[in-house]
Amino acid sequence: MNLKDLINRAVVSAKNGSKKLRILQVQILGGDIRESVEHFEPYGFTSEIHPGAEAVAISLGGDRDQTLAIVVTDRRYRPTGLKDGEVCIFDDLGRKIFLSRDGIKVEG
């Protein structure tokens, strides 16, 4: 087993959110395209990601045919400037629910 094949950065190129687990097509760093990659989300939270979002892809046992995505993020839309301990739920249109040091703020 090659350890460098266990954990990889990937870019989402297509997705299907109609299943119980979202199915992704990702391009792993180095150009390898993986189909039918399951995206595991935390219980109680979900979002419909855009192609171009970035993922941390794990290949079980180093086998890229057994790849799953455990974290998907999209730096194009992520708010910045939060203070330590603050939390923000956000979307691609700039709407936010912001748990700030001054209280809860809803924008948009």
Regions found by a protein language model. Give the residues of each.
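Exposed beta-strand/loop interface patches that mediate assembly or binding
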Residues: M1-L99
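Intrinsic low-complexity, repeat-rich intrinsically disordered segments enriched
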Residues: G103-G108
